[in-house]
């Protein structure tokens, strides 16, 4: 996932970055039914929950591409929370930060996306909401 993320960001490949993120169908059928948002006391409609995720993710993706897209990143490491949040079959890794050192620049550690979802050994970016 990170290799693909870095490559897509360095090439400013919007479609490549979108493909790494959870889709509306994956959210509706795989994530939402096992999310606390689907049960009381929240009992949100799936469309409302998706709208909230997709809005913040879309804004974050645009900011990410504007700030870092098309430039060598100099990826060093990824760090997420020590333990994932478990929601049924889904494991959500939060507080993810990326350490990178662009050529000629100083090392930085930033939140380039909010979280990663893992399900049955497969990983996707849950949201591109970020520190920008």
Question: What is each of the regions a protein language model found here?
Answer:
Residues 109-111, 125:
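A sequence-level detector of short linear motifs
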């Amino acid at each position: 996932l990170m290799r693909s993320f870095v490559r897509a960001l360095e090439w400013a490949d919007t479609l490549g970055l979108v493909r790494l993120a959870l889709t509306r169908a994956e959210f509706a059928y795989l994530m939402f039914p096992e999310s606390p948002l689907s049960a009381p006391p929240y009992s949100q409609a799936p469309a409302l929950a998706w709208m909230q995720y997709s809005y913040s993710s879309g804004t974050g993706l645009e900011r990410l591409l504007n700030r870092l897209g098309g430039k060598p990143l100099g990826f060093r490491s990824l760090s997420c929370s020590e333990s994932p949040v478990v929601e049924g079959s889904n494991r959500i890794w939060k507080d993810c930060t990326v350490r990178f050192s662009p050529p000629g620049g100083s090392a930085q550690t930033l939140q380039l996306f909010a979280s990663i979802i893992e399900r049955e050994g497969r990983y996707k970016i849950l949201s591109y909401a970020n520190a920008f």
